[in-house]
């Protein structure tokens, strides 16, 4: 981290040319979002990007990357020094795409011109899987409303099924839930000081996958929830839909 490296620009860079204009060879953090990049506090990626920038990090944004071509949007800025971050945008991508009657919406309020079709269904999972395939050794942090509300086993209305935690499907290293300004800065600061992504598990307001459950079960503060497998066995998904 270098406090003199802030972009001090009107916008955070979204292309390699804009990074070079700022004198950057590499970004510290690269944010992928399902929304257009609008530098306004109603857009979460812009808020997180500016908060990280204010903490002294070089932050670049890739808005609405194309997941259907040769994936050049996922490669154009190269590897970040610290980590990738992924958000579906201001809305869960399935709510963004479909009505309650599961009809495809004709517009997207978070895309230029209101045009639909510029983000995939289950955007966090799709973006994250692509990033992990291309850059398997770079830490990946997910956040935003889609990640936050899907952090546990959950009923997915659109597929009428139970789904496991989005941490499983996305293969992300860390999930930041809720208002993520404080934890994302701490993650960046500690990684910048040389910590491993696996040494950050004491940070409040995060989720991660761990097969060693014994150390948690001994704590009086631990609340045990049903596993995905147990929930699926009890056919909770079908019960949820029948109520409506």
Where are these regions (language model features)?
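Short N-terminal or domain-adjacent regulatory/targeting segments
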Residues: 1-23
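N-proximal short alpha-helices
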Residues: 2, 21, 25, 104, ...
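A short, flexible N-terminal coil/short beta segment enriched in small residues
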Residues: 16-37, 120, 124-134
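Nucleic acid-processing catalytic cores of prokaryotic defense/repair systems
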Residues: 27-33, 40-78
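Loop/helix-junction capping segments adjacent to catalytic residues or to phosphate/diphosphate-binding pockets
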Residues: 38-39, 185
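Glycine-rich beta-alpha loop elements in corrinoid/cobalamin-binding modules
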Residues: 44, 63-241
